[in-house]
Amino acid sequence: MKNWMLSLFLVLTTGLTLSAQSTVTGKITHDGLQRTYRFYIPLNLKAGQKLPLVFNLHGLGSNGIQQEFYGDFRKIADTAGFFIVHPDGTKHPSLGQNYWNVGVEPSGVDDLGFLEALLDTLSFQYPIDLSKVFCTGMSNGGFMSYFMACNSDRFAAIASVTGSMTTPMLQNCGRSTPIPVMEIHGTADEVVPYDGSSGVESIDEVLKFWTQLNKTPTNPQVIKVLDTNVNDNCTAEHYIYPAYGSSASVEHFKIIGGGHTWPGAIINIGVTNQDISASKEIWRFFSQTKKTTAIHQTTGLQNLAVQYSADASQVTIVPENSESRFVVSCHDLQGREYFSRQLNGQSTLDLFELLPGNYYLQIRSANQFKIFRFFKQ
């Protein structure tokens, strides 16, 4: 996968100039590691307008910039109005390739925490609608999207392209509330087989799991997608498990004869379906979804107080409940993390080592958080 993604990158970037006004590269430090990302700002962003955010995660051996071009949402974002972030994974300890840790690797890299911290950083810097944050990805990025659905409440919906769920992920999925899910997968995928492999669930089992959790009808509506491109050597079927009441929808595009590829991609790397655009279908799916309550509302932290000394060299955190447990982290406006500590009850922290400048404290308790900005003299 690494070699063909490198070839794709060279083809796509030849003679290409990125607009500095549209794409921002950034770094944050999480769990002692410096992490990088690319953030796409759509055209015609209006002052005061809050926009949705799509996390677009690369596959094994790839990176954020390659995924930005291969699984491309940028023209859609310009028209529909949403932000896109393309984060970078870390090097796999044995393979030496970029990857996402979906809970089965011994490296201990906290990718779930990184993506949540990245969301916190971006939402502090940009006008993001936190009720419309979505996660999608290719291959290993699709696995990571499922991992986020199982272990985070920050996303309104997820979509996987050529990804699946590991058996431990499915068996230990911590989610109890419905979340809209889309899976796009080729039946001739030799990297992540449609019928599963050792330690990886089949797509049928993945769909069964989410339709049960989401409380959708067990019999889907099946639509044969019009074969508009007879030269792509594959066809598509669209399976729809609709939502009713408090349930959440599940959709699946089954690419008959399709390979380990992103449908609609401008470069064919293996058998690539051109009857649909995965990016357009994913955004259609995401755009009809909104969390009923804003993510990470401050319920439970409303009465938490933060008191600074005159020169902001110390800060005292006073929760409503003296037995409250929470995590406090300090960041600068570029997202660099200076410390992260777990505290119980009223606590005072020294900020002497911080250089003069603007910072913010993020305080987490269970699944809620608050952010406080301050200036260190």
Language-model regions, residue ranges each:
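Serine-hydrolase catalytic machinery in alpha/beta-hydrolase-like enzymes
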Residues: 24, 28-38, 44-134, 147, ...
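C-terminal tail/sorting-segment detector
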Residues: 316, 356-377
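Residue-level detector of functionally pivotal "anchor" positions at catalytic/ligand-binding pockets or at interdomain
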Residues: 290-314, 320-322
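A domain-start/cap signature at the N-terminus of enzymes
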Residues: 18-53, 79, 83, 136-159, ...
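Short, glycine-anchored, charge-dense loop/turn motifs used at functional sites
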Residues: 330-338, 359
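Glycine-centered tight-turn motifs at strand-turn-strand junctions
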Residues: 24-33, 337-354, 367-368
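Short beta-strand/loop motif that positions the catalytic acidic residue
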Residues: 183-185, 189
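Bacterial Sec-dependent N-terminal signal peptides
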Residues: 1-22, 295-298
